[in-house]
């Protein structure tokens, strides 16, 4: 099948082709009923139930493809968007739509644990290696100006920023850097490389983005997909808690489970009793159940939410 000839009139949706964001992106697509089969030898997959083509790209390239209108939607990290904004400038027409609540990490300045560097001021004039050349250059430009204004370093000193596309954390051990700036999720790779963080440049997570240059014909489908993804993300953050309680205790338990908007209260056949159904933040559900039990709620059930619409 000639894929190029099948892309006309389809919404193009860019997804990271591999790496730390890929599996979570696939889950979002499945949860949004975007059905596809990917040929591992191809970077384009046609969606079976919607006029959409998925384009699998390196996460670092997605902001450029979306921001220049080559694709219409995309998922990438906020770090990659910030880097692209500095690299491309005003030509990047991209809008951040939904924080997808995964891929959270920090872009951090890291130095050897065994060394004597404890602050970024000490790195002015030193060698820095990173995959985020523009972000790091902007960051250290501010550090330099501050250090020079305070008389900590000579005015002619300039920090050396070098780009590498991968294995950033090995740069100090190989003797080509005094510090690195890289993404830190769990910190295991950083510690295994004998590094420690001394400053955070930015925090980042995966986001859904769209081009500002989409045609009006695609807008209805764009809004459908955006709404689906937003609803799926909300569903992953909440569970539904159901319980029975006597009306005399209702004011107290409703403060425990106020719901996302408001709880649903249904009168039971047993006099004086009601059933309550309320959305609760998933990570807080154990504590909520404990409090309900301590305040005379009974028959407490927790139900998962597969999907929702905002």
Swiss-Prot record:
Assigned keywords, A-Z: Amino-acid biosynthesis, ATP-binding, Cytoplasm, Glycosyltransferase, Histidine biosynthesis, Nucleotide-binding, Transferase
GO molecular function: ATP binding; ATP phosphoribosyltransferase activity; magnesium ion binding
Region forming the signal peptide: none
Keyword field contains Amino-acid biosynthesis: yes
Catalytic activity: 1-(5-phospho-beta-D-ribosyl)-ATP + diphosphate = 5-phospho-alpha-D-ribose 1-diphosphate + ATP
Enzyme Commission numbers on file: 2.4.2.17
Pathway membership: Amino-acid biosynthesis; L-histidine biosynthesis; L-histidine from 5-phospho-alpha-D-ribose 1-diphosphate: step 1/9
Role, per record: Catalyzes the condensation of ATP and 5-phosphoribose 1-diphosphate to form N'-(5'-phosphoribosyl)-ATP (PR-ATP). Has a crucial role in the pathway because the rate of histidine biosynthesis seems to be controlled primarily by regulation of HisG enzymatic activity.
Family note: Belongs to the ATP phosphoribosyltransferase family.
Listed HAMAP family: HisG_Long (MF_00079)
Full protein name: ATP phosphoribosyltransferase
Source organism of the structure: Schizosaccharomyces pombe (strain 972 / ATCC 24843) (Fission yeast)
Chain's gene name: his1
């Amino acid at each position: 099948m000639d894929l190029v000839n099948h892309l006309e009139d389809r919404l193009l949706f860019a997804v990271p082709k591999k790496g730390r964001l890929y599996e979570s992106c696939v889950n979002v697509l499945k949860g949004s009923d975007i059905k596809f089969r990917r040929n591992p030898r191809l970077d384009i997959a046609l969606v079976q139930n919607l006029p959409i083509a998925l384009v699998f790209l390196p996460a670092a390239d997605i902001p450029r493809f979306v921001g220049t209108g080559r694709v219409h939607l995309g998922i990438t990290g906020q770090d990659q968007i910030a880097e692209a904004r500095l690299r491309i400038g005003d030509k990047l027409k991209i809008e951040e739509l939904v924080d997808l609540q995964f891929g959270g990490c920090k872009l951090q300045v890291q130095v050897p644990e065994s060394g004597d560097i404890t602050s970024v001021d000490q790195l002015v004039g030193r060698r820095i290696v990173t995959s985020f050349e523009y972000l790091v250059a902007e960051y250290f430009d501010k550090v330099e100006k501050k250090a020079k204004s305070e008389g900590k370093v000579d005015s002619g000193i300039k920090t050396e920023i070098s780009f590498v596309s991968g294995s950033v954390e090995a740069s100090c051990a190989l003797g080509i850097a005094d510090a690195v700036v890289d993404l830190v999720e769990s910190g295991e790779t950083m510690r295994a490389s004998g590094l420690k963080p001394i400053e955070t440049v930015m925090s980042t997570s995966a986001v859904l983005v769209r081009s500002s240059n989409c045609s009006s014909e695609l807008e209805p489908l764009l809004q459908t997909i955006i709404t689906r993804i937003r609803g799926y993300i909300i569903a992953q953050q909440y569970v539904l808690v159901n319980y029975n309680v006597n009306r005399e205790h209702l004011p107290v338990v409703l403060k425990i489970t106020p719901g996302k908007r408001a709880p649903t209260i249904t009168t039971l056949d047993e006099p004086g009793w009601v059933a309550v159904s309320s959305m609760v933040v998933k990570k807080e559900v154990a504590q909520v159940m404990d409090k309900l039990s301590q305040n005379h709620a009974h028959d407490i059930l927790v139900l998962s939410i597969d999907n929702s619409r905002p």
